[in-house]
UniProtKB/Swiss-Prot annotation:
GO terms for cellular component: cytoplasm; microtubule cytoskeleton. This is Serine-rich coiled-coil domain-containing protein 2. The keyword S-adenosyl-L-methionine does not apply. Residues 426-443, 573-584, 601-611 have a biased composition (Basic and acidic residues). The lineage of its organism: Eukaryota, Metazoa, Chordata, Craniata, Vertebrata. Residues 497-507 have a biased composition (Low complexity). Keywords: Coiled coil, Cytoplasm, Cytoskeleton, Phosphoprotein. It is found in: Cytoplasm, Cytoskeleton. Microtubule-binding protein which might play a role in microtubule bundling. The gene is CCSER2.
Length: 834
């Protein structure tokens, strides 16, 4: 198969977007600058992996690309030894990149920043023997990961490359960049040598694990407990050291994350590959293939793929559904997401038939391994589940950061605007892959069962198992979704909720998670499985329906049915499923457990029976609102609540409705009645005004108001009406008076005008006489100008102009011109001013 598998580097996008060079997956800069084949050219591997950037080998492209690509460029950290890691760090511009990655598993001393240098000796790493060293985890951000991813030959298949490391930054905290062995993330298949440091604590795998390029031995350190797994040992023989620490839990998310192998070499995939380097987040979980690590929270590693399935991502965090879809690890040609990430877009082409055969065999192993592993995980994780909830959530959050991409293929995409949301969300399955899937269903029906919605339904009953997180079934996640407030059963998806929101962990990625944990924006679907997404949507719809009902009840049901208050038991049940990890919500338990004692009768105001909504209450949306029983008034409860909780107020309305205090309800009722009474009064007034109805009738129409004051108000209103009538009468009288006065004024004005006219004529007649001028204030000297006028002297006018303000001023000139006694002085008066 290895011979058949051809690793093709596609120059599809020669230039990494946003300055990230497409690293051809095989070459990584050695500390001494020599390119090393990431695939760890295995003796057996016939794979010819060659990196061409624009046809030229780029041995050291990674470091420079990495700097830009990811502030978490863990890339260079894939070093054989810690010293080498430092050297690689030197090459790596970003000190974070320098974080010694435990994935130094390249025999060749690949210093390349690939965290997940899944150097599978092509044969050693059978599809079944996919080994992932968590340290080797690709730092997708650094894109050295893409170079590693660049080529997964089936033999050299990075199939189980630990991409958790790819989801670095947080994983780094874990020591392996986000290499959470998802609760012993994957059981390495019988042949698989996956070194996972499930615990983020084990920052570096033992040099052996880094050196164990052979898939045969990779050290999985969980909480620094190392179990060396012989890749050839059957998975059951593999000893996992479970320390009850986050490491185990980390595996859980990864199971959810299950790297989906992009089987198709589709051009879109390739473009996607070119883009993935763009994802500056090393967090790109390879793949787009990663489901949110939380998807099952518990799908621990029961890798449906199993190492036998050479999932390019060394451990498919394998939601069974994810496994389904991505799941022919390399059916036909598969582009590993990591490969996609590598700008080289190296795709592993594998003979679908060979893969199918191997896959079938591997599946048998996987099934066995998954069962045994699951049982182990169930036992260990039952213990760890609690640990997980207490401590793992933090890790989960780190996983979310770890996979700003892992959790959300989408979040990764958003954090890096460079990535297509849809592509990252979806694994594309070639028909070959589909056929492999079918085989897988045949070979491992129990795993696929989990993928089926029916299994999901079954999973509902398995809440305990879900709590055990060891459950690898996506269905269990879904059951949790509906049944539990813990991690959203679809932790990969919708119910990520606040604990999954940890964008802080993903330095690069802002998780576009809905605060409600409904879904990452962009509707991230589990890779290849849409059933779970449907379940999520169904849950959401159910919650929304409950919301609507409650809203209606609040607004419309003034007559509050006296329902029994929510039982504390129910609240407690909800609490049980709340992740204690969610620090934000931990105080909620207190609220939940509070009896509604302060409500003194609030129970009578429940809008609807709590049971009606209770099945929704267990959904993630209702996960924690402390509001239900908070003694605060319904409106007061909003005041200090976090935004997402405030939203939950609406989501959990049925639960929150209890919050309405008796006083609040009374006020509401009073307000309503007051409004009604006012409206009725207005109506009555209108009737009275029109005379269409009598006060008595109107009073009867009024509802008996709870307030005894209404009767008095009615009488007062009558008095007011009488006063209004009186005022109207007065107004009418005044109007009449006004009209009379206006008439009088008009007549007086006419008379006055006539009088003025008469006076004017009188004045005109007598202005000719000198005595008439004396009253006008003209002194005898005026005669001199008047006499002068006879002499033809017109200069008498200026003194007259001084008096132009008075009519007499014009009259004097007329007088001056009066030499012609027979003439009216009007003409002369006009001449004078002229």
């Amino acid at each position: 198969m290895e011979e058949k598998t051809q690793i093709k580097t596609f120059l599809g996008s020669k230039l990494p977007k946003y300055g990230t060079k497409s690293v051809r997956s095989t070459l990584q800069p050695m500390p001494n600058g020599t390119p090393v084949n990431l695939l760890g050219t295995s003796k057996n591997s016939n794979v010819k992996s060659y990196i061409k950037n624009n046809g030229s080998d780029c041995p050291s492209s990674h470091s420079f690309n990495w700097r830009k690509a990811n502030k978490y460029q863990l890339c260079a950290q894939g070093v054989e030894e810690p010293n080498n890691t430092q050297n690689s760090h030197d090459k790596i511009i970003d000190p974070e990149k320098r974080v010694p990655t435990q994935g130094m598993f390249d025999k060749n001393g690949i210093k390349g920043g690939l965290k997940s240098v899944s150097l599978f000796t092509s044969k050693l790493a059978k599809p079944s023997t996919m080994f992932v060293s968590s340290t080797e985890e690709l730092n997708q951000k650094s894109f050295s990961g893409p170079s590693n991813l660049g080529k997964f030959t089936k033999g050299t298949l990075l199939g189980r490359t630990s991409y958790s490391s790819i989801n670095t930054p947080k994983s780094q905290l874990n020591g392996f960049y986000g290499n959470r062995s998802a609760g012993s993330m994957q059981r390495p298949r019988a042949n698989s040598c996956a070194t996972r440091s499930s615990s983020g604590e084990s920052l570096a795998q033992s040099p052996d694990s880094s050196k164990s390029i052979n898939c045969e031995k990779m050290v999985r350190s969980q909480s620094f407990s190392h179990s060396i797994q012989n890749s050839f040992l059957p998975p059951s023989s593999i000893t996992r050291s479970h320390s009850f620490n986050r490491a185990v839990d980390l595996t859980k998310p990864y199971q959810n994350q299950q790297l989906s192998i992009r089987v198709p070499l589709r051009s879109s995939m390739l473009t996607r590959n070119s883009r993935q380097p763009e994802v500056l987040n090393g967090n790109e979980h390879l793949g787009y293939g990663f489901n949110r690590p939380y998807a099952a929270g518990g799908k621990k590693l029961a890798l449906p793929n199993g190492p036998g399935v050479t999932s390019t991502l060394g451990y498919r965090m394998v939601h069974p559904s994810l496994l389904k879809s991505s799941r022919s690890p390399f059916s036909g040609t598969m582009t590993v997401d990591g490969n996609k990430n590598s700008p080289a877009d190296t795709c592993v082409e594998e003979d679908a038939t060979v893969l199918a055969k191997d896959r079938a065999a591997n599946k048998d192993q996987e099934l066995i391994e998954n069962e045994s592993y699951r049982t182990k995980n169930n036992q260990t994780m039952k213990h760890d589940a609690k640990m997980r909830y207490l401590s793992d959530d933090v890790d989960d959050i780190s996983l979310s950061s770890l996979s700003s991409s892992d959790k959300n293929d989408l979040s990764e995409d958003f954090s890096d605007d460079f990535i297509d949301i849809e592509d990252s969300n979806r694994t594309r399955i070639t028909p070959e892959e589909m056929s492999l899937k079918e085989e897988k269903h045949e070979n491992g029906p129990p795993q696929d069962m989990f993928d089926s919605p029916k299994e999901n339904e079954k999973a509902f009953s398995k809440t305990d198992e879900w709590i055990d997180i060891s459950v690898s079934d996506r269905s269990e996640c879904t059951k949790h979704t509906s049944g539990n407030n813990l991690v959203s059963p679809d932790t990969d998806y919708r119910a990520g909720s606040s604990f999954e929101l940890s964008p802080s962990d993903s330095s690069d990625g802002t998780y576009m998670w809905d605060e409600e944990g409904l879904e990452p924006i962009g509707n991230v679907h589990p890779v290849g499985s849409y059933e779970s997404s449907e379940m999520n949507s169904i849950d959401i719809l159910n919650n929304l329906e409950s919301c609507d009902l409650e809203d209606d009840d609040l607004m419309l049901d003034v007559d509050l049915p006296e329902d029994a208050p929510l039982e504390n038991v129910e609240c407690d049940n909800m609490n049980r499923f709340d992740r204690p990890d969610r620090n934000v919500r931990q105080p909620q338990e207190g609220f939940w457990k509070r009896p509604p004692q302060r409500w003194s009768g609030q129970e009578h105001y429940h809008l609807s029976h709590p049971d009606h909504y209770h099945h929704h209450g267990k959904s993630d949306l209702s996960r924690g609102s402390p509001y239900r029983e908070s003694p605060l008034g319904h409106f007061e409860s909003y005041g200090g609540m976090p935004f997402f909780q405030a939203q939950k107020m609406f989501v959990d309305v049925p639960e929150n409705t209890v919050i309405l205090d008796e006083m609040t309800l009374r006020h509401m009722v009073q307000d309503c009645t007051a409004v009604k009474t006012q409206l009725l009064k207005l109506k009555r007034l209108l009737h009275q005004h029109d005379g269409s109805g009598s006060l008595h009738d109107i009073q009867l129409s009024l509802p008996s108001s709870p307030e005894p004051e209404d009767g008095d108000k009615v009488y007062k209103n009558e008095d007011l009406l009488n006063e209004i009538k009186q005022l109207k009468d007065e107004i009418k009288k005044k109007d009449e008076k006004i009209q009379l006065l206006e008439l009088q004024l008009a007549t007086q004005h006419i008379c006055h005008q006539k009088c003025k006219e008469e006076k004017c004529t009188y004045a005109d007649k007598y202005t000719q006489t000198p005595w008439r001028r004396i009253p006008g204030g003209y002194s005898a000297p005026s005669f001199s100008p008047w006499q002068g006028s006879f002499q033809g002297i017109p200069r008498t006018v200026p003194p007259h102009r001084r008096q132009t303000s008075s009519t007499t001023a014009f009259q004097q000139p007329s007088q001056t011109h009066r030499s012609h006694p027979g003439k009216t002085n009007k003409a002369t008066t006009y001449r004078g001013p002229q």
